[in-house]
Amino acid sequence: LDQEVLDTQPDEVETLLIVLKEIDVKTALSKSKLRELDYSLNPYYGCQFSCLYCYARKFTPHEEASDRWGEVIVVKRNLVEVLLKEVQRVRRGTVGLSTITDPYQPVEGSRLLTRRSLEILLSKDFRVSIQTKSPLVLRDLDVLVRHRERVDVGFTVTTLREEVWRRLEPGAPGPKARIEALKRLSGEGIDTWLFMGPVIRGMNDGEVRDIIVLAGEIGTRIVYDKFNEYGISLGLRGDKGWWEAKEREILRSCEEVGIECHSEVEDWIHEERRRFLPLF
C-alpha cells in the first residue's frame, strides 16, 4: 500500500484472533436476490469486521464461519480461476461485490481476490457495485478510475461517534477513515454512495442529519435502511411509528441538503436508470 492509503487506515481497531481456512469452489458468481443486482460475488466467507448488527452471518453457508463470526475467515482459493471461466459464458450484468462479506477486509490485503475479480469483471464489460467499510479499496484506485463508467463504490457509515463505532463495529475501520476514502473516490469522478444504515433507535438515529450533511459536502448520494433483525437481537425494540417519522426526517434532510436519497428497498430504481447505458 502507498503512504496515502496507509494514512487512512484506522489507528485503533480492536484486534481479533483470526482463523484462516481455504476451500475450493465450483462457482464464483451467484444469482442475486436483490433487484438492483444480477449477480453477487463473495471472495470470502466470514468477515473480520465483526459488526454486531450484520445480517450476513445468517446467510453465510459455511457453518464454521457463521458460528464463529468474525473469528473464522474462509478464503476461496480457486475463485479467480473459476471466475475466468464463468465470465466467458454468463450474460453480462451488474455484480455486487460483496453481499455477505466485506470484500476489502484485512485478509484481502494479502490475498488480492477482490482486486483480481474486479479486474476480470470490468475487463469483460460487467458492471460492479462495491460496498465496503474499508479504505483498502483505494489500493485499487487505478482499476476503478480506468473503468469508472462501469463501477460504483458505497461506504457504510453507521455513526460518526467513536463510542458507537467501537460498540457496533469493533473490528472495522473508523468512520473518519471511511469518509476520507469516500471523498477521494468521489474526487476521482467515481460514482459513490453512502450507506447510512442500519439506523438503530436510541443508538445512532440522532446522527442522521449530521451524516446527510457530510454526504452533501462530499457530493455523494445516500442509501438508507433501518435495523432489520434477521434473527439477530441487540436487545432493541423497533416501532413502526418511530421509523415512519425517522424516514420522513431523512428524506426532508436530504432534500434540504440537496442530495439524492433513497431507501435500500428502492435502490433497484437507481440501478435501472444505469441500465439505460449500454452493457455491450
Question: What do the predicted segments below correspond to?
Answer:
Residues 6-152, 162-163, 175:
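Conserved Radical SAM active-site core
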Residues 79-83, 113-117, 140, 177-182, ...:
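A general structural detector for well-ordered alpha-helical segments in enzyme core domains, enriched
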Residues 120-126, 180-192, 246-263:
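A structural motif corresponding to the C-terminal end of an alpha-helix
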Residues 130, 135, 199-209:
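Active-site glycine- and acidic-residue-rich loops that bind
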Residues 171, 184-204:
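Conserved strand-turn element in the central/C-terminal portion of the radical SAM core barrel
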